[in-house]
């Protein structure tokens, strides 16, 4: 496993900048509503999906959007669609397992098809909305790029089926068609 090392001068500069930023009233990471972390998956032995979550800069009741990247195996966390934050709460997920910072210690947790990936993402969303219950009632959109065109309809179907069967927290899914998902990604981001 590769580790990153930083020089002492670099770390001092970061600490000084952080202190100056808070001294002069610049927003902190907490103020900006940014969260990152892992959720474990109940259908796995040891898998953890990593995510970044950015709260809307406009209104906490703005829609929740999950951004999926393609590849397969491309991390969603390298995307920087800041304009989305003006109109939505945005989730990036490193998926499938062993992409980006997501990991598993058991090879049986690796996924090789859209159904398995969509089950993992559904479990992720259940954990996410359990941690953020105030967002569960908000409109929910699935979007992405490239190979995510395979995952988007699979996840939309999984969410729809989970809602119908009352398997957990009801997710207020607003898009169930891949063509509509593509259109959603281009709605006015101001």
Curated annotation (Swiss-Prot):
What is one process in the GO biological process aspect for this record? proteolysis
Primary location: secreted
| Highest taxon listed in the record's lineage | Eukaryota
Segment forming the signal sequence:
1-25
Q: Which GO terms describe its cellular component?
A: extracellular region
Task: Cite the Gene3D superfamilies for this sequence.
Answer: alpha/beta hydrolase (3.40.50.1820)
SUPFAM superfamilies linked: alpha/beta-Hydrolases
User: Has UniProt tagged this entry with the keyword Oxidoreductase?
Assistant: no
Record keywords: Glycoprotein, Secreted, Signal
Q: Which residues are glycosylated?
A: 58-59, 105
Compartment list: Secreted
The record's annotation in InterPro entries points to: AB_hydrolase_fold, Peptidase_S10, Ser_caboxypep_ser_AS
Tell me a Gene Ontology molecular-function term this record carries: serine-type carboxypeptidase activity
Family under the similarity heading: Belongs to the peptidase S10 family.
Mind telling me what this protein is named? Putative serine carboxypeptidase-like 54
Protein species of origin: Arabidopsis thaliana
